[in-house]
Each structure stands twice: as C-alpha cells, then as structure tokens.
C-alpha cells in the first residue's frame, strides 16, 4: 500500500464571498418567472500544484487559488388546469463565467490527467485544455519534404518528426517551423457556456406522465478513447470516420483522418484537438 496523493498538513478551508440578487413574480395563477444574478469569489482555493518528481508525486494540494464566478439563471413555469386534467411546464437556462484571479503569484499551472494536459492560468477559466492543434494530414511526400526545407520561411507546414504521407499536420503556434510541446495552446474547456432544461408533466386523476430534458452548450469533451479507435492502428477497432481516411495522394479522403497503419508514426498518438468533441 502507498499514498496516491501527497499529504499537506497546512491545508485549510476554502473561503467564498457571494452576492445573489433575485426576482420572482407570477401572473394570472398560471405563469411564474424567476431571475437570479450572482457573483462569488473563492479564495484559498484548493489546487493541485506541480512538485519535483523526486518527491514521488507529481502534484501536492495547496490553498493558493482565488477564482471568481459570475452568472445568471432564468426559469419560466406554467400551470394549466382544466377539470381533472393538469399540465405543468418548466424551462430554465443559466450561464456561468469562471475566471482565475490569482495563483499565489504564479501566472499559470499545468497538470496532466489521463494524457490530457490542462492549464490553469490567471485571466482564464480553471482547467483549459492545453493541446496541439491539428491542421489536416500530409497529403503527399512533397508536403513532408517541404516541411524540412532549411529555409523555414519556405515551409508551408511545420516539420513533424517521423511523419509519413497521411499523418497529422499541426499548427506551428510558436512559429519555429517545427512541432513540439511548445506548440500547445488553449483549445477549449470542459465547462459549458450555457446549461438548460425543460420538463413537462401531465396529470389526469390518478394517472401522470412526466418528461424531462437537460442539455449544455459551448463546452468541449476530451474523449481519450478516440486516441485508439481514431488512430487507424491495425490492432484496434475503428469508427465510421475510417471511411474518410487518407489512402493515397489520389484518394486523400476528407483530408482530416489519418492513414491506416500498424503502428502510429509522426505524432499521431499525441493529445490534440482531434480528441475534443464540441457540444452544439
């Protein structure tokens, strides 16, 4: 047995200051409206801080963060009654904006979970995805040869070590003509911009029927499983996207799906935007 997380005897409680303003009113015994606005600031927030690997741990929990949340919530409910029949409906929508205010003097922190790197940065939401950005696939050997041109100003695409035709290209974020970890950038967040829901309930005497729907919009989901099933490796199953894979220069597919292969080459197995799903 061994501890999975480093202990910290100096940990304390998080502190939150919050202001909430609300408005609620009804009309004709049929309609009910609710509107809430809130702002909160959490200090001494518990965050996992990277530590030297010789400690035996990658991170240690510390009270160093300050984060603000601001948002609005709205709901509308209706009640209709005709004799023994009652029909109730409710719709709600909310939006929250999260921002890191302070990290104990640091500007940013990186943490990695299940091969996905997250960046927590002052002025940004907590836990943005921090990945490479795919830029289609190399259509032919000529594009790869061009990416190796000694005159980097002539390169159409950045150099990817070990890449073959049909392998992923990536955007050269730092502009040095080569793809490496310095080309990672913020590529989205798991927190939705909007959360909404709708429910309806119908009652007649002792019978009732209820339906409830919920959804989110504007967030991204990292699907690590795609790293294997969308990598077109021979030892794994594939999704229907495989039909759009690169086959040859004359049959490039959609230009977004890598070639079929026995073992990934280039940086096809690297965590990138190809693993991120965007909600509608």
Each model region followed by its residue ranges:
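Outer-membrane beta-barrel signature, preferentially recognizing the C-terminal barrel domain
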Residues: 1-32, 59-82, 125-128, 189-194
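Active-site beta-strand/loop architecture of penicillin-binding DD-peptidases
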Residues: 40-42, 51-62, 182-184, 188-194, ...
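Conserved small-residue
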Residues: 62, 81-188, 230, 239-267
